[in-house]
Each structure stands twice: as structure tokens, then as C-alpha cells.
From Swiss-Prot:
Pfam families, alphabetized: DS (PF01916)
Species in which this protein is naturally found: Picrophilus torridus (strain ATCC 700027 / DSM 9790 / JCM 10055 / NBRC 100828 / KAW 2/3)
Active site, UniProt feature: K284 (nucleophile)
Role: Catalyzes the NAD-dependent oxidative cleavage of spermidine and the subsequent transfer of the butylamine moiety of spermidine to the epsilon-amino group of a specific lysine residue of the eIF-5A precursor protein to form the intermediate deoxyhypusine residue.
UniProt-recorded name of the protein: Probable deoxyhypusine synthase
Reaction(s) catalysed (UniProt annotation): [eIF5A protein]-L-lysine + spermidine = [eIF5A protein]-deoxyhypusine + propane-1,3-diamine
GO CC annotation: cytoplasm
Cofactor: NAD(+)
SUPFAM superfamilies the record matches: DHS-like NAD/FAD-binding domain (SSF52467)
Amino acid sequence: MDRNELLKEPVKDISIKSETTISELIGMFGRSGGFTAKKIYEGYEIIKEMFNDDETTFLSFPADIISTGTRGIINELVKRKLVDVIITTNGTLDHDIARTYRDYYAGTFNFSDAMLRDLGINRLGNVFVPDESYGSIIEEKVMPILDELYKEKKEWSGYELIWELGKRINNESSIIYNAYKNRIPVFIPGMTDGSVGSQLWSFYEMNRDFRINLLEDEHKLSDIIFDAKKTGAIMIGGGISKHHTIWWNQFRDGLNQAVYITTAQEYDGSLSGAKLEEAISWKKVREDARFVNIYGDATVILPLIVAPFLK
């Protein structure tokens, strides 16, 4: 390889002035040489291509970030129809519904969990969730909706059920309300997990002919995949939401673009730790795909990287 080819891009200092915009700052990240800053720039450029192209954009994420202010970022992406498909976990329903009606509170990682238990406060990282802001309010809101839906028909697909929950919540702060409003399907492969999952189980125990047909969700996903000209994905964290996203994309020879934000490492062979490079071997990401792995806290990186698109 020609030495000059390796030395054609000098490292430039970041220079911030009072009028510097976030997109200008991210542009400077791209010329700064290292380390995660350059990856944030690469992710921004890939996401810009996703949003500007005629392609189907997937957004996958775990539930924990919905307990934080990052919920507002996800909600804006949905509200502005910048994403076409959401794949997440059942806790997203829990936190989205609960926070529509009750507050969560800023806490700390370092506190006596035994004391919190005695006080009726649950800790999610450094977010404090009072008992009254979680299980009871979810039951209070979800069970009457299930009663209504059951009277309408006995069997629902998962994504249709989520739309119906969002429709009845009818609150602009809610992700699932805006997903319903914009007809963006929300897929939850692990539908029976979490508090809303427990409500579904409880309702089933009282109404044994009630059904959630998750294979209808898979049918809907297959239609989306096979109709897509191109696909891109913004994947936050790993687990089932990431895997279901890349799993379905293997049936069209892989994603065309992908941005993966994670703190997990690949040494243990986990799906969460697996780099996008590994997904190429499984045909879940295309060989010629444009992609980047960004290591860091999604509650910092995601708002920064998508802020220019939300102005």
C-alpha cells in the first residue's frame, strides 16, 4: 500500500465558537482523528443517508432508555416519521405507559437498595421508580383497554394491540401513541415479559379464548422486508431487539446501512457484544454495507447524533 494513501487526512483541532451548531460540531468530530468522536461522525453520515434515501429504516432498542429522557428523542423520531419500523422489548410499553401518567425520578447508582425496597422505590440504574409509578398504574390503564379490545375481537397481532393501546392513551408524549398515529409498527418478540406482559397473562387467565398472535407480527415483518428496496437500522444496545432486526434482514441478504450503539464487548461471544462485522458472516449485514459500531452510552450518543435532524 502507498504510504501517502495512509497519510492523506491530517488531524484537525476542534474549534467551538458561540455560533457553532451541533451538525458543525459533528463535522469537526469527523476531522478530529480519534476516537469515538470520529465514529459519531460516521454514524451521523450513515443516518443522514438513511433518512434521505428511499429506504426502510429500522429502529431497535431495549426498554431501559425509555425510563430516561432519551424517551423524548425516540418519540421525536417516531413523531416525525424518520423511522419506519420499531423492534423493542416489552419494558418499552411499561415505561412509555407509566411515564405518560406518573413521574420517574433522578436517582443515583450508589444507594442502599435494601432501603429503597423498604421505601417502595425501585432502582433502574440511577433512575428511581416509585411503586405507584409502575405496576399499579400500568394495570389501572391497560386492563380496561384489554376489556374493550376483547369485546371487539378475541385475537390480535402484537403490533395491532400496541397501536390500540397507543390510540387509547392519546397523549403526544407517548411513543406508542405516535406510532399508532403514524402507522409505524412496533414489534416486540418477547411480548409476555414485563408488566404489560403480566397484564396480558392475567387477562388471558380470566378470558381463555383471548389470543395474541405473534406469528401475524412475523408475517407483517416479512412483508416489510421483502417489499423494501433498501434497509437501514439504528440499533441501540443488543439483546432480542437487535437480533430480531438483523435476523429478518438476512432474508434480503442483509442491511444496506447500520449504526450500532453499544457498551458491550465481543469477548464473551454474546449477541450484544457482537460487532456488525460478525453479522456479515451470517448475511445479516451486506458485504458492501455502510456501517459503524459506536461504543458509549446511548443516552449521550443518540441525542447528539440525531439532534441535527430534529431541528
